[in-house]
Design a protein with these regions (language model features):
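Beta1/beta-strand and adjacent pyrophosphate-binding region of the FAD-binding site
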Residues: 1-11
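Residues that mark the start of a beta-strand
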Residues: 4, 25-27, 147
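Membrane-embedded transmembrane-helix bundle of lipid-linked glycan/lipid transferases
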Residues: 6-8, 17-18, 22, 128
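Active-site-proximal beta-strand/loop segments in catalytic clefts of secreted hydrolases
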Residues: 8-10, 31-34, 152-153, 260-261
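N-terminal Rossmann-fold NAD(P) dinucleotide-binding loop
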Residues: 14
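Conserved N-terminal/central alpha/beta ligand/cofactor-binding core
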Residues: 20, 26-27, 32-126, 177-178
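Conserved beta-strand-loop-beta-strand element in the redox core of flavoprotein oxidoreductases
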Residues: 124-143
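Flavin (FAD/FMN)-binding glycine-rich loop and adjacent Rossmann-like elements that form
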Residues: 137, 141-148, 152-289
């Protein structure tokens, strides 16, 4: 069967593209390697969402705001709240399980079709244009045709395998941003954590200029514990090449995402290197416990 639009990747970028195309009258197929939608936000513990605002002005709206509104309506997000570290203007905590359900519903309402547990295997090009892709799933290898193909793989796999010129890493040495394996902690005493930070602002110098904002903002997000981190590294209990703990509340009571591991000098587009990075990520997560 041929679709008007075939989208490789069911993360939020792929999902919003799918919804927009289907609402415009196109037949849409989303090819997703996991058993659920949401990409890094649901599969990798990435959160909160960021960059909806630049200062006071909201710069991301449309379908993404629809998703946030739907999450809020079901109690799965507090919506946009101030970033107490002020890296960005606002952050948007959310429930990953809730986002999976919202995306399922939105794509079905729009008339999109989804193939879960399906991997892109080959890109078939004719006269300089993609004519079809070969995918692999429980049915084996089979070909999917489309009028338009959208690369929402996250790594540009569709574009790269079609022969497009790709740029990866810094021009001078090819180095890319370190990889991270997030870990989620539950049962955290938020009031005790917040009280400690407010009682020792000198130990959380990145928060210090915004301590009043931190005092009134929920859920809690912070960066700190530099001294404890340094001591653990000196004692050989941590092998992580960063300086502190970075953590974000998800909005669920006592639940936090620690964005603190750091896997350097590995390549997420190389199968062997990526496999080693997975091992190192789990090792670093265990060190944090």
């Amino acid at each position: 069967r041929e679709f008007d639009v075939v989208i490789c990747g069911g993360g939020v970028s792929g999902c919003t593209a799918a919804i927009a195309a289907a609402r415009s009258g196109a037949s849409v197929l989303v090819v997703e390697q996991n058993g659920y939608l949401g990409g890094s936000l649901t599969a990798c513990g990435v959160g909160p969402m960021m960059t909806f605002h630049a200062g006071e002005k909201q710069v991301i709206r449309g379908i993404m705001q629809e998703l946030v509104d739907a999450l809020k309506a079901r109690g799965w997000s507090s919506g946009h709240v101030a970033d107490t570290k002020q890296y960005t203007s606002t952050i948007t905590p959310f429930s990953a399980e809730g986002l999976k359900l919202i995306l399922d519903e939105k794509l079905r309402q729009a008339g999109c079709e989804v193939l879960f547990h399906t991997f892109l295997g080959h890109v078939n090009v004719e006269d300089g244009a993609i004519c079809s892709i070969t995918v692999c799933n429980k049915d084996g290898l089979h070909e999917l045709s489309g009028r338009v193909f959208v690369d929402a793989t996250g790594d540009g796999d569709l574009a790269a395998w079609s022969g497009e010129t790709m740029t990866k890493g810094r021009p001078e040495d090819g180095a890319a941003q370190p990889m991270t394996m997030n870990v989620k902690y539950c049962g955290v005493d938020t009031e005790r954590l917040k009280s400690y930070v407010l009682a020792h602002p000198e130990r959380f110098f990145r928060l210090a200029p915004h301590m009043e904002l931190f005092r009134v903002t929920e859920p809690v997000d912070l960066e700190g514990f530099d001294e404890e981190f340094k001591q653990a590294k000196q004692e050989g209990r941590l092998s992580i090449s960063r300086e502190n703990i970075l953590m974000f509340g998800t909005g669920r009571d006592g639940e936090y995402i620690l964005n603190t591991t750091r896997i350097v000098e590995h390549d997420a587009t190389d199968a062997v290197s990526l496999s080693e990075a997975e091992y190192l990520g789990r090792k670093q997560c265990a060190e944090l416990d």
